[in-house]
């Protein structure tokens, strides 16, 4: 009997902050399961979830507006600790009898708050001390409105010159509010505050660990599928690879992985996937060489969105054909992860996040009646990687830079041809190899090469040549929503350029992309 790793759980109500998923990841890092729901959940849904504590997230709206989001009243009647962050603190204050006003002094960025009263939330936590020995905390503010009067049964725990109620608390009811973001790294003691709330105040045990998650997933897979056969589309990416390893541990040879080689993968990637999963780990893999089919479908197409749709459609066709060849397959496995499925149960107000459906494999043939199994659907990407390590997958594979689903199909600009893909594969491999050799690979968030469908004149020896151009792209980012181009050393860029032009016959010029996001996107197409 496996341990119930969901026994202690935190409910996070999302009011629309860009940091809300980060709050959830921080709680998970503390070893505690949590779920992220839209703010307008019902009392029945909260009761059914039975949380050990509730966190109210930040959000972009103003509590002073008439129709702005409010926490369900039951949140404050459930008898569990509640932690309001930024907007979450403001709606807590307002709903419990305090007052919030739009502030003339908006606070964005670093601030130092002074702890003026004792509280279980921050007891013994400090970054510095005032001259008279009071604790100071370095925090990250991001708010326009501010609480101007706290509810009568709350006390002020910390303040700044412009924010008299930076932390408020009702210790008896275990309600806490902070006017800053403890989940971001700029709030230096933020993880300690979250740990104090989740582990001490809510009394949650650290049951959510990679080893226990694996045991739980294996038990649930076995319970769900029994002795049935399962099929999985294996791409070699992180999500499908970890899904494959979990299923293999749970059901062994009853798993069949279909690996479709679309001709749009990185250099030697198909061979590496087959060697690792087939030869090394002993998974049952059906290898489908389909380069000609994909390239023929892409012939003559220049539009990036049309190329994506073609690649997706052909993949589904090929996968379906292979699935039909297998006998008695009852289940389709997918590597769906938690950010793909975060949603609210039917939102009454329409203010909840739009549901994002995500399918690694598209529609299945009507004659195939299969159940769906998604072993990773509770996990964030960083958790998937940790589980992959625990399952024995190599670090370099799990922590590779992101690679787009359509592969080189969107890194060859314009029409996709085999010649272009082959040149791009070799140029990109040189760039990545040199990044690793210079210990720069893990210092940038993503790096890749783009093939430009333009020719440029070059000189080789005594002759001139008229060959293709590639662009190197490297960016630094925290969340991939915004990004800076990476300031790679000139001598490094020169070395990469020389190697590509000398070793890849057909490329005469290498350029470096110095566009940030925004205005540019990270990928060119």
From Swiss-Prot:
Domain of life, per lineage: Bacteria
Listed EC numbers: 6.3.5.2
Catalysed reactions, semicolon-separated: XMP + L-glutamine + ATP + H2O = GMP + L-glutamate + AMP + diphosphate + 2 H(+)
Record-annotated Glutamine amidotransferase type-1 domain positions: 9-207
Primary role: Catalyzes the synthesis of GMP from XMP.
GO molecular function: ATP binding; GMP synthase activity
Official protein name in the record: GMP synthase [glutamine-hydrolyzing]
Enzyme class: ligase
Pfam family, one: GATase
Chain ranges of the GMPS ATP-PPase domain: 208-400
Keyword Nucleotide-binding: yes
Name of the gene this protein is made from: guaA
Active site positions: 86, 181, 183
Key words, A-Z: ATP-binding, Glutamine amidotransferase, GMP biosynthesis, Ligase, Nucleotide-binding, Purine biosynthesis
InterPro entries linked to this entry: Class_I_gatase-like (IPR029062), GATASE (IPR017926), GMP_synth_C (IPR001674), GMP_synth_GATase (IPR004739), GMP_synthase (IPR022955), GMPS_ATP_PPase_dom (IPR025777), NAD/GMP_synthase (IPR022310), Rossmann-like_a/b/a_fold (IPR014729)
NCBIfam families according to UniProt: guaA_Cterm, guaA_Nterm, PRK00074.1
Entry-linked PROSITE patterns: GATASE_TYPE_1, GMPS_ATP_PPASE
Transmembrane segments: none
Listed pathway(s): Purine metabolism; GMP biosynthesis; GMP from XMP (L-Gln route): step 1/1
Species the sequence originates in: Shigella boydii serotype 18 (strain CDC 3083-94 / BS512)
One GO term describing the cellular component: cytosol
Residues that bind ATP: 235-241
Binding partners and assembly: Homodimer.
């Amino acid at each position: 009997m496996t341990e119930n790793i969901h026994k202690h759980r935190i409910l996070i109500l999302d009011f629309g902050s860009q940091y809300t998923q980060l709050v959830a990841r921080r709680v998970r890092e503390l070893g505690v399961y949590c779920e992220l729901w839209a703010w307008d959940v019902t009392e029945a849904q909260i009761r059914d979830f039975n949380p050990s504590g509730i966190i109210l997230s930040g959000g972009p709206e103003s509590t002073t507006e008439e129709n702005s989001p409010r926490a369900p009243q039951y949140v404050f009647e459930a008898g569990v600790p509640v932690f309001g962050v930024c907007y979450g603190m403001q709606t807590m204050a307002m709903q419990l009898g305090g007052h919030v006003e739009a502030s003339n002094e908006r606070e964005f960025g670093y601030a130092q708050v002074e702890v003026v009263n004792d509280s279980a939330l921050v007891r013994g936590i400090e970054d510095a001390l005032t001259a008279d020995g009071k604790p100071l905390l370095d925090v990250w503010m991001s708010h326009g409105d501010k609480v101007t009067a706290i509810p009568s049964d709350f006390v002020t725990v910390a303040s700044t010159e412009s924010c008299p109620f930076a932390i408020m608390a009702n210790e008896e009811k275990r309600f806490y509010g902070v006017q800053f973001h403890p989940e971001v790294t700029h709030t230096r003691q933020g993880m300690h505050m979250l740990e104090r709330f989740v582990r001490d105040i809510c009394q949650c045990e650290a049951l959510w660990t990679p080893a226990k998650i694996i045991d739980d997933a294996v038990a649930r897979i076995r319970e769900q599928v029994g002795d049935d056969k399962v099929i999985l589309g294996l791409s070699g990416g992180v999500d499908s690879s970890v899904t494959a390893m979990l299923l293999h541990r749970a059901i062994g040879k009853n798993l069949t992985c279909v690996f479709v080689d679309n001709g749009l993968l990185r250099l030697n990637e198909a061979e590496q996937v087959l060697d690792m999963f087939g030869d090394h780990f002993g998974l049952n893999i059906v290898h489908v060489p389909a380069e000609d089919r994909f390239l023929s479908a892409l012939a003559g197409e220049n539009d990036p969105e049309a190329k994506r749709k073609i690649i997706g459609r052909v993949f589904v066709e090929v996968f379906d054909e292979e699935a039909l060849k297998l006998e008695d397959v009852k289940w389709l496995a997918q590597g769906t992860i938690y950010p793909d499925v975060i949603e609210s149960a039917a939102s009454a107000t329409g203010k909840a996040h739009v549901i994002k459906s995500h399918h690694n494999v598209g529609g299945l043939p009507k004659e195939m009646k299969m159940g769906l199994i998604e072993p990773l659907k509770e996990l964030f990407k960083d958790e998937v990687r940790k589980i992959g390590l625990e399952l024995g997958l190599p670090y370099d594979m799990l922590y590779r830079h992101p690679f787009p689903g359509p592969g080189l199909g969107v890194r060859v600009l314009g029409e996709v041809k085999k010649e272009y893909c082959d040149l791009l594969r070799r140029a990109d491999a040189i760039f990545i190899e040199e990044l690793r050799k210079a210990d720069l690979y893990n210092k940038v968030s993503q790096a890749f090469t783009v093939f430009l469908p333009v020719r440029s004149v070059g000189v080789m020896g005594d002759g001139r040549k008229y060959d293709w151009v590639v662009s190197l792209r490297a960016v630094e980012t925290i969340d991939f929503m915004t990004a800076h181009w990476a300031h790679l050393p000139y001598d490094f860029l020169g070395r990469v350029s020389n190697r590509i032009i000398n070793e890849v016959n057909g490329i005469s010029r290498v350029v470096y992309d110095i566009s940030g996001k925004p205005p540019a996107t990270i990928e060119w197409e």
